[in-house]
Every structure is written in structure tokens, then in C-alpha cells.
Amino acid sequence: MDIPYIELTATDRQILNSYALMLDGLGAYLGEGYELVLHSLESLDHSVIKIINGHYTGRKEGSPITDLALKMLGELERDPARTVSPYFNKNKSGALLRSCTIPITGEHGRIIGLLCMNFHMESP
């Protein structure tokens, strides 16, 4: 059984849907070297609601949130003033990534989702 992490309002869902549309444009603009992932915190077991270039990590819509994204979420929740800054990471095959995790705030000022951007450093 899928246990919700948070309950989303209709407005929260509308906010996340607007980000999903933005991902299409960002993906077209930035190109194949970028993986863009939109997470909804309504269900951590199926948090990925939109993904562009998921072939780099093998993720798809309906995939669960990663341990790293959960760690970043915890840091963002503990320190709301924390600025978003890029960091380096590796995917499962060991390829170097430059990543950024951006919190998405909903109707009541709480974090309802995450926008994760991963640039694959070995991309042409």
C-alpha cells in the first residue's frame, strides 16, 4: 500500500502541473545532456511525476524518490533559508553529474515537490 508523505491540495497539484510543462521547455532548450526530474511529495514510492532524459538513470514516471533527494529534502526542511547550490554526484554507472535540487513550495508555504536537474558531465 502506498502511504502518502503529504496531502496535496488542488492548488498544490496545479503548481506541480505548471512545473511539468516547464520541464518540456527546459528539456528542449538544454538538450540531451540534462536529466530533469519533477518529484511530487504526495507519494515517495511513486514521486517522479515528470522526467526528461530519464535514460541516463533508468528512471521513469512513477519511480520512487532517491535516497539523495530525500537527504536534500531533509536539509531543505531543517533550514528553509538554505540557498540552492549545485553539487557533484555520480549515477549508478559511475558517470559524473553536476546536480541541483530546487524545492517547490505549495499553497500553504510547505515543500510539495522537488525539481532535480542533473547535467551529465560526459555529454558532448
Regions found by a protein language model. Name each.
Residues 25-85, 90-92:
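Structured interaction and signal-relay segments at domain junctions
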Residues 1-29, 113-115, 119-124:
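Juxtadomain coupling helices with adjacent low-complexity linkers
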Residues 72-124:
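Sensory/regulatory domains in signal-transduction proteins
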Residues 3-7, 17, 50, 54, ...:
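Generic alpha-helix detector with strongest preference for long hydrophobic helices that associate
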Residues 9-11, 57, 66, 83, ...:
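Residue-identity detector for threonine
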